[in-house]
Amino acid sequence: MSSAGLLSGVEVGSTTVTATKDGITSNTVNVTVCSSLAGTCIDIFDAGGGKLFTSSPSVAYLDRIGGSATSGTITENGDYGPAGDFYIFDWNNANALCTTYNTLSLGGRTNWRLAERDELKMELYDVYLNMFTARGWPTDDYYWSATPVGSFYYYVVLRNGYVNSYTPSDTVYASCVSNP
């Protein structure tokens, strides 16, 4: 642990952490260190100002936390995301995923929602470029947005910034966002 109180993982595995300072003891928290996001972890990324984005969940992660409605799986081969299996979602199930995160108070927050097109494109891709390179996210498939266009919804490709739209029944990745 750093002098600023930052904990850094040095080995893959799980543990619990409790901190004490000036006679005050914190709550105990569970900490899991993963070798990649294909494991039982998810990336909760602060893109600035406390605004958090999640990577799309792996099968291992979502199953570990109790699951949510999904629409299938995709296997990343390591070219555009960490090698492993990830869930994909139709638009309704993508929204349900964010509701699941609220129920679980993911990252201590209960205001998770599906990211808007401009949040994915302008706040993630335009700033950090390829999210697999930047953060280890799966990017072989598109990411749903909450932004409608007629009876469709926009998606953003987080490996190249491409934006287009799909019908709500199509199945792709999902990133949930939480404002501070």
Role assignments for model-derived ranges:
Residues N95-R113, R117-D170, S175-N179:
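An exposed tryptophan-centered "aromatic clamp" motif
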Residues G5-G9, L52-S55, V156-V157:
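Generic recognition of long tandem-repeat/solenoid scaffolds
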Residues T15-G23, D63-T70, L124-G136:
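Surface-exposed flexible segments
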Residues A4-G5, G23, G50, S151-F152, ...:
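Beta-strand-connecting loop/turn residues
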Residues C34-W112, Y154:
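Extracellular adhesion/carbohydrate-recognition regions
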Residues S2, D46-A47, L158:
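Acidic surface patches and DE-rich sequence motifs
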Residues M1-L37:
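Extracytoplasmic soluble-region selector
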Residues S26, L52-T54, V163-N164:
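Short, isolated positions in well-ordered beta-strands
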